[in-house]
Amino acid sequence: MAKLYYMPYIFNEGMPLASGPPTLPEDFTPEKSGFRVLVEVRRMKGHFPAQKWRKRNQEWQCINNETLLPDHVRNGHLAKNVPYRPYRPVYVPFAMTVSPTTDAMGTSEETRSKQTKGSNDDILSAKIAGRVARPVYHCTSARLHDLAYDPWPITTIDTHGLSSLKAPSTHTRILIIGAGFGGLLFAVRLLQAGFSRDDLLLVDSAGGFGGTWYWNRYPGLMCDIESYIYMPLLEETGHMPSRKYVPGEELRTHAEGIAAKWELEQRALFRTTIRTLEWDEGGNQWIAHAEQLGVFTDAKQGGNGGGGPLTFTATFAIIASGTLSKPKVPNLHGVDDFQGHIFHTARWDYDYTGGSPANPAMHRLQGKRVGVIGTGSTAVQVIPQLARWSKELIVFQRTPAAVGLQKNQVTDPVWWKGNILKAGSGWQRKRSENFNAFISISNPPCMENLVNDGWTSSPSFSAAIGGALNMQPDFLDLVKAIDRPRLEAAQDHIRSTVRDDTTAEALINLNHGWCKRPCFHQGYFETYNLPHVRLIKTDAAGVTGLSPKGILVGDTLYEVDLVVLATGYDLGSLCPADRAQIQVLGSEGVAMKEKWAGGPTTLHGVMTRGFPNLFFPGTSQAGVTANQSYMFDRAAEHVAYIIQNSTLEAGGYIDKIRIEPTAEGEKHWTTQSVARISAFAATTACGTGDYTISNRYRSSDVDTMARHMPWGEGMASYVKILEAWRESGTMEGLDIRYHSSEGSR
């Protein structure tokens, strides 16, 4: 099998390919970029001739010499300073092995055989590679090219204040990858630990703060975790959420408010993607190779450019890019033949639907037939909104979502003052931990249920996240007994709400409450009583594909004008580098992905040996809960302590510090985490679901799978261990060195 790699520096618009290969920076090498190269530019909707290039023996060679590529036209506008997007670009991360597979356009078996059995395996067709290696911001279909662009107007970027960061010699002390709630929490906790704003640099491919709440702006968007515990730093900012579950716009503006309060706007580098992090042992620093995507005042018409390669260094690096950053696009046959409109919920097209994120009145859908593919948490929120405006709505469901009732309400200022603020200092953390206790069956009988919502009424979810009772031999019987009333109540609610019996039965989720992340909504099931809304239950294979007129399920065609892909995000690998799509090379030149191939070894789930001064909040060997903001906050607090104490020991000279786990330290922690794997035994009773072993932790090697699992005793146990470790002051399990001009000590 061959290895194929996407080349990030691709053709400029209208460039005569016959005149030479793609332009590369003078210092470009595959090792620095994190990719090897295979470039294939193919026909665009059958209209444009194409050329292939390959690099062989350090020289570019043209494989087939044809004509020039015309300027690329997007949505009727000439796109300037935007890389040409090949029809089926090859985009394969470093070290990923690509095997032949059926092409989405239906390449014949004979053709595939010729392509894969050629004398030079390095020139495999992009048609084959494209299906195996689906990129994040580059798609195998020209129809879905909008996933490669930021559709939102600039509101938070000072485009003039970042020019100094473009110099290759730029150095920052602490690099934070991600500017969502996770990245902001790390920045704030580091500032509170005594570091200055000038010590920090936040880098994000988005055009502003917010992370998943920056990219997602679809109608009906809200967080289904109570906003009083999910929205970080409420106590410090003094912000009162407008509702128990606030809409997405408020979450995004809250992220911007956090950045403003701690004056982080000038310490953020947006529309920038880090491709490679490489440890420089001699310089005791990370070398970051990045690509600036440019600043666009109107993403659909191009912009003022400003993109290009960027290299800088950092003493410490924190990967805080989160898990919901890679839109999942189904490999649908016939996408490019569909004559209607299509987009993903992560890049909502209000130009087509009408409305805006602040006022999603989709008046342009009146008279339109809309098809929604997917029934996960995103679809549950967006389907009722689409039903309000469309002429006809067809929902295509493979497996039903587990949807509980969400009782949202406006926040009463009097209640807020008399109940929330009255709890005193630390109220948000206490409320969060109360929530954690109830969803992990760790609450004492006398404990008041402060959040009191669908989550805290579904304690069987403990089987997916760990808890104090999970280690008991009879836990599976216990959790099934706890879950049975919830399951029966959910079935009764659907049957009493949905008038059509066939539709009602199709909407019933029979899985245990811990097998798939639950959803919560007001009015989802009622939507299916509307005369213009239909539910199509597919088989396990899902939708067959698209035709020029609509969506195919088997041989049946459902004609639609718009296809909405509510297919969620690709959770992908549990390796932090893979999840962030960064090639991370450690002190021995070993890629993090390679080290994690046999299962991770970590200290506290936030560091791994061989990758000095690198931190990564995640789920492997760490405590988890449904409230990801709490997880980020606890990790940020812990990492800030480690860096702060090490800096104090070094006399304040942060650039001299080199920190990594000892071999014994990470072995001990990993052993302790693996010893608690029985806490997740109940997940073996599940089928396919985003929290099951079969889906997220599947491995032919049981030990590898066990190393990827969270801390089995739950979040409270994990936090208690970390607090005791910090209180001891010994920094046990860490190898801390202080570099000087004479070496390290």
From Swiss-Prot:
Cofactor note: Binds 1 FAD per subunit.
GO biological process: dehydroaustinol biosynthetic process; terpenoid biosynthetic process
GO cellular component: membrane
Pfam families listed in its UniProt record: NAD_binding_8
Subcellular location: Membrane
Disruption phenotype: Impairs the synthesis of austinol and dehydroaustinol and accumulates the intermediate compound protoaustinoid A.
Disulfide bonds: none
Principal location class: membrane
Known cofactor(s): FAD
Entry membrane topology: Single-pass membrane protein
Site (Transition state stabilizer): R517
Cross-referenced InterPro entries: FAD-binding_Monooxygenases, FAD/NAD-bd_sf
Record flagged with keyword Transferase: no
Listed transmembrane segments: 174-194
Binding site for FAD: T212, W213, Y214, W215, D224, I225, Y230
Job description of the protein: FAD-binding monooxygenase; part of the gene cluster A that mediates the biosynthesis of austinol and dehydroaustinol, two fungal meroterpenoids. The first step of the pathway is the synthesis of 3,5-dimethylorsellinic acid by the polyketide synthase ausA. 3,5-dimethylorsellinic acid is then prenylated by the polyprenyl transferase ausN. Further epoxidation by the FAD-dependent monooxygenase ausM and cyclization by the probable terpene cyclase ausL lead to the formation of protoaustinoid A.
Protein name: FAD-binding monooxygenase ausB
